[in-house]
Curated annotation (Swiss-Prot):
It comes from the Archaea. Belongs to the prokaryotic AdoMetDC family. Type 1 subfamily. It comes from Methanococcus maripaludis (strain DSM 14266 / JCM 13030 / NBRC 101832 / S2 / LL). The modification Pyruvic acid (Ser) is found at S63. This is S-adenosylmethionine decarboxylase proenzyme. GO terms for biological process: spermidine biosynthetic process. Heterotetramer of two alpha and two beta chains arranged as a dimer of alpha/beta heterodimers. It catalyses: S-adenosyl-L-methionine + H(+) = S-adenosyl 3-(methylsulfanyl)propylamine + CO2. The gene is speH.
Amino acid sequence: MKQLGKHIILELWGCESQALDDQPGIEKMLVNAVKACGATLICVKTHKFSPQGVTGVAVLSESHISIHTWPELGYAAMDVFTCGEHVKPEDTIPEIEKFLKPEKTEVMDIKRGIIDDGEVKE
């Protein structure tokens, strides 16, 4: 069996609220995470909400990394979806944790596009 992509979902709790509200810092974290997993960056776009919170996405040749933050709750939700054998989405986690400093990180690992003998598995 083969998979077309790997998707990790991160639940980050107890993060530093200042980091969660730092738009330039989040942009830098996304770029560093892309480098860490070996992906190819196309662009990064972030948006700062009022009074707080940041949403961002790094668009990759191999898919995307996204983040949504709630500084008032110390929480961030992230998706790292990659295609291709050379990209390792789990290698983004140390870069993300270094910047956000969560007390707890939950990781869900999903295999996307499972193919069995050259055909899509139903």
